[in-house]
Amino acid sequence: MALRFVDWDCYFEEPKSDVFVFDALYAPQYIEEGLLYPLGKTIPESSVYPAWTLEQASSQGIYYGIPQMVCMDTLFYRKEDPAVARVQTMQQLYEAIGPRKTQALLPGRDEGVIADFSLNNEMKYYNILQDHTGKVVPVQAMGNVQEDAMQYLKELYAMTGTATGRYDDGNEFTRAEWFAQGHGRALYAYPEAMSAIVRLGQGDDTDVKAISSCEHPDVATAYVDYVSISSRIPADKVEAAKKLTALLTSKPYMLAALKPASKEGVPQYLLAARQDVMQELAASDPNYQKLYRHLYRAKSWHVMAGTKDFAAWEAKVGPDIERDLKK
């Protein structure tokens, strides 16, 4: 049976392909709408996955997805900066760094946080709501935009600068490169930003941590990608689809995908959901060890989860968030 790969983005449309990878944020919606094929009461090698990665993978005892990758907001900072090293919340970060001193695209070494808003402002606001309410799914707060929660998104933009925050050249590593080249006091991005930092020779001088998005303790939510099968799959393709799903989440496949192609190569520094894969990556590379210890194992994580009508809520609050940011 021949494989055909199709570009698809779960943030813009619902799944149509036989086997697909998607953000578990939409798992409740996909399961509710009957879009996912039931995988059964067990999944291959379930013991290698931390329990939290499976939080949204099943419903009523039936699995609909297998975890593949995890990702979380990450604060990168220089070892020479003890004030930032002590930070545990976004409020403390703002108190330590404050708003930008200049509005140039590239901040000086002694100012600002270079923040990556590559998902969207709605997602960052949702993350703030989680920490602000202390709930993984803050249903009661998911109405109109709350000014007290918005204040933290405004402070993050103040530390970043509007031009820097809105900048988009299509290169996901541009901000990490700026930080590695000496701009900004900190970088607020995703774990894979470590790849550009190491490539530019700054890995040994850079530390990482996860912090709360507001003044309250971190609820610690992480993005998890699940591999699933479409409920529309023809009956004669089900077994082949199950084999592909198992392959895409297997240890050999994950290690082959995440390790550099050569000894001289720089790892991608993406985080696997499987603990056995992360342990091997951490043992093979000191900067993967940082990500494993200070991110993957550092907190009692929860899967970033939404409601069954999450996409509709995003569309509703998006324009209001943009208006508030311009005030």
Could you tell me what each predicted segment is?
Residues 134-171:
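Glycine-centered hinge/linker elements that transmit conformational signals in sensory
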Residues 25-31, 188-205:
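A ligand-binding cleft/hinge motif common to bilobed small-molecule-binding domains
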Residues 22-74, 85, 209-211:
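Hinge/lid segment of periplasmic solute-binding proteins
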Residues 7-20, 28, 33, 81-82, ...:
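Short helices/loops that flank or line small-molecule/ion binding pockets
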Residues 1-26, 236, 255-256, 319-327:
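Conserved N-terminal structural module of periplasmic/extracytoplasmic solute-binding proteins
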Residues 200-264:
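Extracytoplasmic/periplasmic substrate-recognition and gating elements
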Residues 64-68, 73, 91-142, 184:
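Extracytoplasmic/periplasmic solute-binding protein
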Residues 221, 255-327:
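C-terminal capping/gating helix-and-loop segments adjacent to ligand/active sites or protein-protein/ligand interfaces
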